[in-house]
Amino acid sequence: MPLWVFFFVILTLSNSSHCSPPPPLTLRMRRYADAIFTNSYRKVLGQLSARKLLQDIMSRQQGESNQERGARARLGRQVDSMWAEQKQMELESILVALLQKHSRNSQG
């Protein structure tokens, strides 16, 4: 027998004795089903995380726009108040001028 055949037979016999037999079909099917479930579960968790992230971003943007609207409303009230005060001061100065003119006319 050639030497290489002898080594081949020895390697074949030694490899088959150390290898465990393949798991039964039911165990492989169970593992396959577990892998499918795990992958699907990861996808669902990823989708939920993405959805929550989008909702957080949208609520932050909405909160910022509400703050901007509130700031604009406050600014509008301040401008209205300043405008009203300015008009009141102008009216007071007109009334004072009219009263002074009237008092000069009545004295003179």
From Swiss-Prot:
Residues 1-20 form the signal peptide. Residues 21-31, 78-108 form a propeptide. It is found in: Secreted. Keywords: Amidation, Cleavage on pair of basic residues, Pharmaceutical, Secreted, Signal. One of its GO terms (biological process) is multicellular organism growth. Its main location: secreted. Can be used for targeted secretion inhibition. A construct with this protein's ligand domain inserted between the C.botulinum neurotoxin type D (BoNT/D, botD) light chain and translocation domains, when injected into rats, leads to decreased growth hormone production. The GHRH ligand domain binds to the GHRH receptor on somatotrophs where it is taken up into endosomes. There the translocation domain inserts into the membrane, releasing the light chain which cleaves synaptobrevin and inhibits growth hormone exocytosis. GRF is released by the hypothalamus and acts on the adenohypophyse to stimulate the secretion of growth hormone. Belongs to the glucagon family. This is Somatoliberin. It comes from Homo sapiens.
